Amino acid sequence: MLKTEWKEQGFIDEPVAAGTDLKAEIRRLCKEKDAIILAHYYTIGDIQDIADFVGDSLALARKAAETDAKIMVMCGVHFMAETCKLLSPEKTVLCPDLNAGCSLADSCKAADLKKFKDEHPGYQVISYVNTTAAVKALTDVVVTSGNAKKVVDQLPKDAKLIFGPDYNLGNYINEVTGRQMLLWNGRCHVHERFSVTKILELKKQYPEAVVMAHLECKGPVLAVADVKGSTADMLKYAKQSDAKQYIVATEAGILHELQRNCPDKEFIPVPPEISESGLECSCNECQYMKMNTLLKIYNCLKHEWPSIEVDPKIASDAVKPIEKMLELS
């Protein structure tokens, strides 16, 4: 029986007995319930360590579409859990904390996008995967940072395109493809805080280091980066490169997987720029991703809640651009 307070707060914080091995209990429940744990690179290391699969948005979407498990626990943010449900509607998809949102998804409301579409007839809409199902339902094709260029390159050269909500990613794709897409003015609150100044300061300390930056970073940051791409692109490069030091401009959670795969290499996270208040916060971490905890995962598996549901009408329209993305990538 779900408590009212759990429903109101969007997660279950039921305590466990002292000394409980949460990792072991989670794996036990996964086996009993035919469940798998999917985790994004930005979650905490303990979660990545117990996950059945760790990846970026594109890899997680592919895994969600192909899994035979009855239950998926999506350890990431809400739109990722929605994407899992859209691709596997017959599965139970659990989200450890319904409050795990996304600043990019929040920046683009379905009603606002519909109004913008109506003002620009004849335009196709490309939506970044960091969007709600309702926004995807208004979209022609979805992209991730790992496949955006590849997908856009396959669209007709004369196509009139709207890209959203990530302005920085859209601006980069415009530059490398020569397109003139209309760009939504949304930004990731983490990647927006990385600056050229901080990167150059680190470069003085580590002159031989390779600078890797996520495509959600601002243009000037990408301009000084040696490697520009998704988290999966960064991981692939670090594993194949002979370089021993890397300056990393993306959410700090990726450092766990980078270090696990490349134990003999050094990864230096770029600190956030000092805010206008003069106080420096840990803005190279996504507070939404960090809402996922072992206790919440255990409880959501135990009670099979919070579970994700998508309105059937929205779902039927929203899954099409995701499937088109998977076909094109």
Residue ranges and their predicted role:
Residues 1-248, 255, 260-270, 274-329:
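Active-site loop-to-helix "anion-binding N-cap" substructures in soluble metabolic enzymes
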